[in-house]
Amino acid sequence: MHQNQFAARLHRKVVEAVQLPPVHEPDLAEPTGTTEVKIPNRSFTHVKSLKPSFKYGVRRGGPDQDQYVRFALKQYNLSLYEEIAGGTRKPGGDAALYDELRNFDGPDIKKLEDIPNQEVRSHILRAIRDAEKAFHLEQKPKRLSMQESVDELKPNTAAGWPWIGKKKALVMPEIAQMAEEIHNLVKPYCTDMEVRMPVEEFRLPWCMAATRGGMTKDKTRPKTRLVWMFPSAILALEARIASPLYKAYVKQCKPLLLGRSPSVYVQDWDADRDTTQWELIGLDISHFDSEVKSFLVKEAFRIAFNNVHAFSTETLEKIQKMGTVEERNDHFRWEVNKHKRIRQLLQYYFINTPIMMPDGYAFRKKRGVPSGSFFTQVIDSIINYVYIRFTEYMQGTIFAHDKLRVLGDDSIDRVLRGTYDLEKAASDLEQHLKVTLSFKKSILASELKDLKVLGFEYEGGR
């Protein structure tokens, strides 16, 4: 009886999490006093508005200056202190978060066929195939069991919706239960892959908006980064695939700049380069995450999922114990289908991510890469790989095979001198993929010291 009551209460929590109650219009009047509050502009063209919920608080950061750093600078370098004294890492308020969300409010390319130029499509397809080869794992890892994936979550971090204000450590059993319930949504569609799974009708928990600041010298114009705080139940489902995938890439030395100190990695990578023949390129895409088109996200998900076995160790042991060969084969096919259905669900959520803003309003994006997913880094990396190869194919660039390295929106590659042009690359990306190349941050250079990769500058080639 006690277990039934607990299950009923847990079910009500899940229902409450996905059926958000309407509330009164938030009070947007500017408060009296000296502080000026900028009212957010909530009108969007492509981002879909959802039913509003309730307000919640967002941590905005600590003081503008660290007291110990301030004391040390005043004592030993007063001129430097006076130069940076007006700076801050504090993010902005709700209006700044809406400005960040607005970056996702743009036209999308849903499939490759929507690009009219056949030659451009062929170059994009070649770039995707190159990425598929580069990210292919010879030894594919097995996916995790549900309990193993829950154990991958960081217990001292926020649990997200619906456990607002709680750490994951306090609600681990509930997270596992909700993840299992979402996982069970796909099971009725695993027998026959011809049957369409209505994933858009599934009631899935929402992301919450968090914020992260960037250093700026003018505290009246703070730099703000919108953080998509994924619900723990979705993270637990993602971890079944993403966690073993990252570990496999570190071990098998694939094109991700992972597993070693970035400074050592890049120096070793550049050690055998003939500087008289090969130049270095590093591209920087403005608003990288928000400008990614959904057809590239789908291709990146396909590549990622194809590099993880559809079975956990636990599932394989279960199949091996089945009585007849026919039973084992049937369950084998069912598990493969479930792997594909889980990909459909997580891919849909990744592209069409719902987010609740601190003022209670909620929205659903239709393109771009959300920052809080387990898949964010690998999806960004695959797409970045495609961007660079695409620009090289469009120019007929001669590039060094197996030398392109990426991590998220950072990249470094070798090209033959005189065969690559940044202006042409910017034009091709803007015209055909609707993304903007930052000339200020992109580099075409002869020496490693002229590049900045993963935040490192290599003075004197080191």
Segments the model singles out, each with a brief description of its role:
Residues 1-209:
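Non-catalytic, polymerase-adjacent accessory regions of viral genome-replication enzymes
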